[in-house]
Amino acid sequence: MKDINFIVGQNIRDLRHRNGLTTKMLAKMLGVSQQQLSRYERGVNKIDVSVVFKIINIFHVSYEYLFPETENDYTESIKSSFVYMEPLAI
């Protein structure tokens, strides 16, 4: 089984490519360095939850897209934490 960081990184790279963005462009949109984005995409670094939310909003995808169904308990714990998060109505 592949590491969850690698899977998430591949999904981010896929989204970036399908939307015609360079690492420099997406890194700027996410507020991270180009090097950090590259580390996320390669699965070297764990992605911060705030960056996950930005990716979801930028590409209009669900967390299930980034964290696909796997047998990994870590994935299930991440997904369950999002179930109870809803946007605040101001």
Give the positions of each predicted feature.
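A detector for short, charged/polar N-terminal pre-domain segments
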Residues: 1-7, 75
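Short basic helix-loop element that most often maps to the first helix and adjoining turn
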Residues: 10-29
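Recognition helix of helix-turn-helix/homeodomain-like DNA-binding domains
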Residues: 30-46
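Conserved hydrophobic/aromatic packing and binding residues within compact polymer-binding modules
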Residues: 12, 26-27, 37-40, 66
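Short amphipathic helical patch at the helix-1/turn junction of helix-turn-helix
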Residues: 6, 17-18, 46
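Short, charged recognition helix plus adjacent turn
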Residues: 68-90
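DNA major-groove recognition helix of helix-turn-helix/homeodomain DNA-binding modules
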Residues: 50-65
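Helix-turn-helix DNA-binding elements, focusing on the entry/boundary residues of the two helices
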Residues: 12, 23, 34, 49-52
